[in-house]
Swiss-Prot record:
Listed Pfam families: ABM, SchA_CurD
UniProt similarity note: Belongs to the SchA/CurD family.
Domain named ABM: residues: 24-115
InterPro entries cross-referenced by the UniProt entry: ABM_dom (IPR007138), Dimeric_a/b-barrel (IPR011008), SchA_CurD-like (IPR007575)
The name this protein goes by in its record: Protein SchA
Length: 380
């Protein structure tokens, strides 16, 4: 058994993090069209060199089912989750895999942190140098978190608020193992953020939601108001839009103290200076762990969503967030405040300057997003 010397320690109350230093194994299952096996092999060979040059990529394999020649998979290994996510949610990714599109009926992607591996002794040193292996698995509750974000035309904000505040909720049951748990919608200026929680299979839930007539009606009503051109009847246009809109969850922490009837949910918007988004997301994840771990903190759970230079935190608090602005912002420590001051684009928030102890209540007001809807399924 090969075990890395670099061992990360993730608290038991963190069911999700991409910041633990683990390598990532991605399995992409492909259902290809009958008779296109040779074309799939040729397409893979044409794109493989480009994928191999992506930062963080270690290796990949193209595999064909022993039993069914139309079932294939691509398995790849990456140095870290942030590097993989940066590529997977990019337009560059869509362009690279385009040669496969004509031959694929459907896909299913699964992403895993590498916990342990067995290797020959002579390979041990090389494997040990590639990322951390975790001392124990993360413990979770089978809930997957994801978000999408997009901007609407400034003169359409009022109409968009009406559409998103009054839509009919879709059927929460997806299948025997998957159901929608919670959907929270927020607005900051003309930016919409939709955060969803799913018990079970996220991809199955997203496909289920997209097929629901009430959701299709809402999306059709929104299309003329969105700044990015999109045609949801065109699979390529829809794929491009939702790739650009993806705002993946990169960290989640829960207190384990339970939630009472006065629990409130708020969303906070953290625009970063160019290139500072990853560092800001790491800082807020680290500080969020400390805040939730404090028995005196009102924060009972928080999730960090990150893409490029945009970070959004979803925070559940026992009582009003205004009672503890530093804890809610995850900026309650002097060192964290100083680091955030270097990373945050305070001007984009309309703030006079970087956050400091005295200005935290005002900074919370600047960062707080406008809630539109927050819907939970009855069984959740």
């Amino acid at each position: 058994m090969t075990v890395s010397a670099a061992v990360s320690t993730v608290p038991d109350r963190v069911p999700l993090t991409v910041f633990d230093g683990s390598r990532v194994r991605v399995v992409l299952m492909l259902d290809i069209r009958d008779g296109t096996q040779a074309e799939v092999l040729d397409a893979y060979e044409r794109m493989s060199d480009r994928v191999a040059a992506v930062p963080g990529h270690i290796s990949d394999q193209l595999c064909q089912s022993l039993e069914n020649p139309t079932q294939w998979l691509i398995t790849s290994e990456w140095e870290s989750a942030p590097e993989f996510l940066a590529w997977a949610n990019s337009e560059e990714h869509l362009e690279m895999v385009r040669p496969l599109e004509p031959y694929v009926r459907g896909t299913h992607s699964m992403r895993y942190s590498v916990l342990r591996e067995t290797a020959e002794e002579r390979a041990g040193a090389g494997a040990a140098a590639r990322g951390a292996l975790q001392p124990r698995p993360r413990i979770g509750d089978n809930v997957v978190r994801h978000a999408v974000t997009y901007t609407v035309k400034p003169d359409s904000v009022t109409e968009v608020v009406k559409i998103l505040s009054a839509y009919t909720s879709p059927e929460v049951r997806v299948d025997d193992t998957t159901r929608l748990v919670r959907t929270s919608l927020f607005l900051y200026g003309n930016r919409v953020v939709r955060a969803i929680e799913v018990r079970g299979d996220l991809q199955a839930a997203l496909r289920h939601v997209a097929r629901q007539p009430e959701v299709r009606a809402v999306e059709e009503a929104l299309t003329p108001h969105i700044e990015q051109d999109r045609d949801l009847t065109d699979p390529r246009s829809a794929r491009l839009f939702f790739t650009r809109a993806a705002l993946p969850a990169v960290h989640h922490v829960v207190s384990g103290r339970g939630t009472g009837g006065d629990t409130q949910r708020c969303a906070l918007y953290y625009p970063a200076h160019p290139g500072a988004g990853p560092a800001l997301a790491r800082l807020l994840a680290r500080q969020g762990e400390a805040t939730v771990g404090d028995p005196g903190s009102p924060v009972v759970a928080c999730t960090v969503f990150h893409r490029d230079d945009l970070v959004v935190r979803l925070v559940d608090t026992a009582g009003a967030p205004e009672r503890a602005p530093g804890a809610v912002l995850a900026l309650h420590e002097p060192d964290a405040l100083a680091e955030a001051g270097r990373l945050l684009d305070a001007a984009a928030l309309g703030a006079d300057g970087p956050p400091d102890d005295r200005a935290l209540p005002t900074f919370l007001a600047h960062a707080r997003m406008r809630p539109l809807t927050d819907r939970q399924s009855p069984a959740s």
